Every structure is written in structure tokens, then in C-alpha cells.
Amino acid sequence: MFTRRALILTGAAGLLAGASRRAFAAPPSPNDPVAIVNAIYTRAARGKGDGGGGFIIENNAAKAKYLSKSLVRLWADADAHTPKGDIGPIDFDPVTNSQEPDVKSFKLVTEKLDADRAVIAVTIAGHRAPPAKPEDQVIRYNFVRDDGQWKIDDISGAVDGEPWSIRDMLKESLKEVT
């Protein structure tokens, strides 16, 4: 005969056994490219979704947190060659591929993931009408391992169907100086 205590313990064990393993899984590592990009876009989509992603490049500390050492160096070189008072070579928000951030929702796809490199593609949707060219909604993040941590080594996208890359834009700005 079952006692009330045995019945309760059996029911509790059944509930625990049926609970999703994800409920007990560790949260995603901040050193995981998908988790990093997800965190960037979760922040960019907050509120009205107009905050953008400038926080990843707003100062040297932010750049060091998110970007690879080689990209930080390249950016510093480009900034050093920008005349005082001028806007640097990156004059838009690369996270939202815009001058006026608008992120309502986003979808991440891992295009490549191996031991030292990763490519994460993000398709963003805003509150306003989508761009005429669908490829303008996709931003790609190229990651590399930098001192054992995943860092963004390039951000790329398209405007009016024409591709752009942060790394290429920075390199091009240095060519214009020489």
C-alpha cells in the first residue's frame, strides 16, 4: 500500500525526470560566437530597437572586448590617419547596417564553426519597411580565436546589394592616405 509520502515522492521524481535537460543546462558561454552575436542583437533590439550596436565599437575598451587584436589595430591605424574633426572611415552602425538603427527581430545562422574560425550570419527585421534588396538585411560576423577567446575579426553586409566589409573599409581608408 502506498503512503501519502511515497506518492508525493514518486510524483516529484516523475516531474524531475520529465523536466527538460535544457532547464538544467549551463547558460551559453560568453566565449561562444553564437552567444556573443545573440547578446549583441538582444541588446540592439531592446525597447524600440533603435539603440543600435554602436556599443561594440564606441571606445577602446569596447573594441578590445568584442574585436580581434588585428581588427582593433587596423581600426586604430585608420583612426590615427583621420584628420582631426573628421568622421572616421566607419560612419554607420555595422551591427544594424544603417545610420538609423531599427531592429525588431533577428535570426542567427551558423555558416561555419571550427576550432579557430566561425562565421555567424544574422538576418534582421525592423519596424520599418524592409530594404529593396534582401541581402541588405544580412550581416555576417567572422570570428577568430584570439588568446583563446572568440573575437570578431570582420563584420560584413551589403547596401543596395553592394557588399561591404569593415576590414576592407578600414584598409581602403589607409590606402587613400598614402
Descriptions of predicted regions:
Residues 1-13:
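N-terminal secretory signal peptides and thylakoid transit peptides that target proteins
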Residues 12-15, 119:
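Localized chelating/binding microdomains
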Residues 23-25:
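Boundary at the C-terminal end of the N-terminal hydrophobic targeting segment
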Residues 27-86:
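Core segments of small alpha/beta cavity-forming domains
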Residues 67-134:
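Surface-exposed, charged secondary-structure patches
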Residues 108, 139-144:
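Hydrophobic/aromatic beta-strand elements that line small-molecule binding cavities or substrate pockets
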Residues 117, 127-137, 146, 151-178:
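Low-complexity, intrinsically disordered terminal/linker segments enriched in charged
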